[in-house]
A protein has these predicted regions:
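Hydrophobic ligand-binding cavity/cleft-lining segments
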Residues: 1-41
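Short, Lys/Arg-enriched, disordered terminal segments
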Residues: 1-8, 128-136
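Short, surface-exposed coil-to-beta transition loops
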Residues: 1-4, 54-58, 78-84
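Structured loop/turn residues at secondary-structure junctions
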Residues: 8, 12, 49, 74-76, ...
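A short, structured loop/turn motif at beta-sheet edges
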Residues: 13, 62-66, 86-94
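Hydrophobic, Leu/Ile/Phe/Ala-enriched alpha-helical segments that form helix-helix packing faces
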Residues: 20-27, 123, 127, 131
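Glycine-rich portal/gate segments that line the openings of hydrophobic small-molecule binding cavities
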Residues: 28-31, 35-76
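Beta-strand/loop substructures that line and gate deep hydrophobic ligand-binding cavities in soluble
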Residues: 71-125, 132-134
Length: 136
């Protein structure tokens, strides 16, 4: 499954890099079924429920020219892997999601489109509030 979206924002690149490199900020906002995120250094472990099934997502945040969330997703014996890439420019974010695994059948285009459009619609305000909270 591949999904990409371009998001326009009023925030500068440096502030976006700081906030969007935090899995506790990004993951629950992009994937609403995620209810808990634990972070240790550049690794994350997220838990949630989707369609009555508990799942676990674990991976790493790679920081370079792009922000990359490389992850494994598991639930009830099913496994998948994916990558979320954020190309952050001044006032614009190109978001690319790639995933191959068991959840592809369940989440499909309907949920992913809804989640991504909701993330894009709310991002500017969510980042604004997070900048206030963190004093960035």
């Amino acid at each position: 499954m591949n999904k990409s979206i371009t998001i326009n924002t009023s925030h500068d690149r440096q502030s976006l890099l700081i906030i969007l490199s935090d899995p506790k900020f990004v993951l629950p906002k992009l994937f609403p079924p995620i209810k808990e995120v634990e972070v240790e250094n550049d690794s994350f472990n997220a838990h949630g429920r989707f369609m009555a099934m508990s799942f676990n997502m674990h991976g790493n945040v790679l920081r370079g020219a792009d922000l990359v969330y490389a992850f494994y997703l598991s639930a009830g014996g099913g496994m998948g892997q994916g990558k979320l890439t954020m190309r952050i420019k001044e006032r614009e974010i190109n978001l690319e999601f790639e995933y191959d695994g068991w959840m592809e059948r369940m989440s499909g285009i309907f949920f992913m489109d809804r989640w991504f459009s909701g993330f894009a619609r709310r991002l500017d305000e969510d980042v604004r509030m997070e900048r206030i909270k963190r004093k960035i």
